[in-house]
Amino acid sequence: MSKIVVAGGTPLYGDVRISGAKNAVLPILCATLLADAPVEISNVPYLHDVITMINLLRELGAGVTMNEGIEAKGRSITIDPRWVRQRVVPYDLVKTMRASVLLLGPLLACYGAAEVALPGGCAIGSRPVDQHIRGLQSLGAEITVENGYIKASVSQGRLKGGRFVFDVVSVTGTENLLMAAAVAQGTSVIENAAMEPEVVDLAECLITLGARVEGAGTPRIVVEGVERLNSGQYAVLPDRIETGTFLVATAMTGGRISMQQVRPQTLDAVLGKLTEAGACIEIGADSIRLDMQGRRPCSVNLTTAPYPGFPTDMQAQFMALNCVAEGVGVIKETIFENRFMHVDELLRLGAKIQIEGHTAIVQGVERLSGAPVMATDLRASASLILAGLVAEGETIIDRIYHLDRGYENIERKLGVLGASIRRMT
C-alpha cells in the first residue's frame, strides 16, 4: 500500500495550477446521460473518483473518449450517451464512491428506470440518501430500497414537474433533483436548495446543453423541463477546496504562492479566515496571491456551515494550521459527525487538541514532530500532509488512497513549490 513521506521545515514558494473541481465534475459527468448526442467536458481532473465514474458510465453502455490523454493538462472527456442500455449501477463499482448515487436522477429521468447500489465513500458519518429519494418521488418516481439497492421507476412515461422542500440542505440531493427535473415534463421548484458553487456549475452545464434553469446559487431553483438535452462542450470550474488547501499549506510554512485561473469569489469564507490568521492576500478577477513570509499564523475560530459559510471540506486543513498557530483556536463542525478522526493522528505529531462533542479546541504549539500517521478520509489526508510540511523530521502518512480520490498529483505540485515530499510504495 502506498504511503507519502514528508520532511518538514521548508516554506512553499511559486506558482501552482489548480485542477478542475472533483465535486463539480462528478455530477457533470452524470448529467451527460441527459443528452441525445455526445458531450465534451474539459478541465477534468485525474482522480480515482473520476476514473470510477467513467467506468460506471462505460458499464451503463455510454461511449467514453479520453481526449489529449487523461493525464495531460487541459484534458477533456467526450461522453456519448446514445449507447446506454444498462439501468443497473452495480455495487462493486460504487462501493468506494458516494457520488455514484448521482446516476439515479439522470437514469430515471431519461430511461424510466434505475437501480443504484447504496454508495460508499469516506467514513465521516451518516450521509443518508432519503432526501434524494423523497425529492425524486415528488416528481412521480416510485422508489424502494431493498437488497442494498435503490430501485426506481416511472409508471407513466416521464417524470412530472413538482415542488420539493429539502428538510436539510443537501448538495448531492439538490444535484440529483436538478438533473431529473431538467428533462421532466413541466415546471419543478426546488426549495432550500444547496447554494454551493458546484451546484451552480452543474446548472450552468445543463443550461449550456439546453436546459431551462433559473435561481441556481439561491435557495430556490426553478426548472422548466425539456424533452432531452443537446450536444455541447463545457469546462469544469477550478477546485476551490484544492485552492484552499494550497493556500493554507503556504500560510503554515511561511511561504508565498500565486494561483491563476481560479475563482476567488467561491472562497470568501476561507480567504477571510486566512486574512484573520495574518496572511497578506491579493485577489484578482481569476487569481489569488498569498504572502506569509517570516510570520507565524494566528489561531482562528471557525464554524462549518453550508455555502456561503465556511466549508466542512476545509475544516481539517485549518485544524492543522491552528496546531502551529499562535494562540487558541476553536473549531465547530456542524455538517458531519465523526469528522474529527484526524485529531488522534495530529496528536501523534505533538498537537494539543481537546474535543468536546462537535467542537475542537486547539492550543497552538511552536513545532510538531514527524511520526507515522494514518489517513482516515480524504480531507484528513490533506491535513496530515500539511502538518508534515511544518513538522521536524519525517512524517509518514499511510492509507493515502483517500488522497487520490480528491487531489490530483498533490505531491508533485507541492514538490514544485519546494516541499520535500515523495510517494513510497
UniProtKB/Swiss-Prot annotation:
Record Gene3D superfamilies: Enolpyruvate transferase domain
S-S bridge residues: none
A GO molecular function held by the record: UDP-N-acetylglucosamine 1-carboxyvinyltransferase activity
Pathways per UniProt: Cell wall biogenesis; peptidoglycan biosynthesis
Pfam hit, one: EPSP_synthase
Modified residues (2-(S-cysteinyl)pyruvic acid O-phosphothioketal): 122
One Gene Ontology term, aspect cellular component: cytoplasm
Main location: cytoplasm
Top EC class for this record: transferase
Chain positions recorded as UDP-N-acetyl-alpha-D-glucosamine binding sites: 98, 127-131, 313, 335
One of the GO biological process terms: cell wall organization
Family to which the UniProt record says this protein belongs: Belongs to the EPSP synthase family. MurA subfamily.
Cited HAMAP family: MurA
Name recorded for this polypeptide: UDP-N-acetylglucosamine 1-carboxyvinyltransferase
Gene transcribed to yield this protein: murA
